[in-house]
Amino acid sequence: MIARLQAAVGEPDARIIVRTASAIAELVGPLPLRAGDEWLTIGVEGQPHIHVRTADVAALAFAAPDDGNVAIEAHDAAGARIVRVAFSRTNPAKADCDVGRRAALIDRHGGAQ
């Protein structure tokens, strides 16, 4: 699961998003992901980065909706989204959609959940 998330954040133009009711933080990839004893670090220490508690990541969900970008989300045990990795310009409902890139991302990341 961690390797799959690492591959996703390493994609060009990946958007790593953390959202709460009051704030949204977004980093642009490709970014490294490092797994420590307790935390995953997305990005580089000393630069903007995100820490995700490894133990809280219970599942990854892949989505390729007809009206949105291809994305992978990390969820906790209750099903709440922790972090979302969306791939820009992969929304088929928009004129700037890169159809070939969308298909490649689906092939690369849309496999086993």
Language-model features, listed with the residues they occupy:
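Surface-exposed, interaction-prone regions used to assemble/regulate multi-protein complexes
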Residues: 1-113
